Amino acid sequence: MAALMILPASMSARKKSSDIKVISYNIRLGVAKDGTNSWEYRYPASAMMIMDQKPDIFGLQEAYDFQVKYLEEYCEGYKSVGVGREDGKHEGEHMSIFYNKKTTKLLKWGTFWLSETPDKPSMGWDAACFRTATWALLKDKASGKKYYYVNTHLDHVGWEARKNGMKLIVDRIDNINPKGLPMIVTGDFNMTYDRPEFDDRKKMMKNAREEAAKTDHHQTFNGWGKANPNSIIDFIFYKGFSSCPVYETITKPYMERKFISDHYPITATLVF
């Protein structure tokens, strides 16, 4: 793939020592035949968005191995963890977590499947696809504070899979975070926030869109301009942070592309 033609002049993020900037980005699977919206046309704009926004961490949904490798190559200073959902290695979509090596240290990570057998590649309940969640224990280098980050993509068909997948994530959070460190959960949840499947999540975590001092209520699924304007199905949840000053749906064009995916990326700044 060709290198990016133009990148923002400054690649190093300037951040307050207690801030974490996170992005959730359903990148749209790279094998989809979307005409001029296919990956072959929009891949430079995806990298441009990351380098422009300069997050400390970001989570991808629907990313194939070659998309992950492309962003690692062209988003200077970022490294990722995650596995393909089909085989636990490279095949299928990755729920990758990227981190900025200048601001963030990776301590440990893992992936589990949203199924009755979460420790091996498997499809759960009434799901149409294998579904996973990737988690990481990270350390903010500026403040020295540790936190957990979970990135996921719930099923687009099965309501039981969404309900039970959500419960499994909540249960796993308790297991992997016994000390109650700050926690961030991002993803494409394939349902709106008024669904009862979110009830347990609402009790334990805050929704950045609703809590931020500066926010918006823009749709997150755009369907290449054809989606319902109320399609808010991507979320950033958090707990253990003192505040969320900014939440934003990233709708600005990059490299003259109105859409860099069929979902808009979303971002939030969280303060310890």
Region locations from a protein language model:
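N-terminal, active-site-proximal structural segment of metallo-dependent hydrolase catalytic domains
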Residues: 10-74, 87-92, 167, 272
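Active-site-proximal beta-strand elements of phosphoester/diester hydrolases
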Residues: 19-31, 95, 107-112, 145-155
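Catalytic metal-binding/acid-base residues of hydrolase active sites
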Residues: 28, 64, 153-155, 189-192, ...
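Structured beta-strand-rich core segments of catalytic domains in phosphoester-bond hydrolases
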Residues: 57-148, 243-250
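Metal-dependent phosphoester-hydrolase catalytic domains
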Residues: 160, 164, 173-183, 191-272
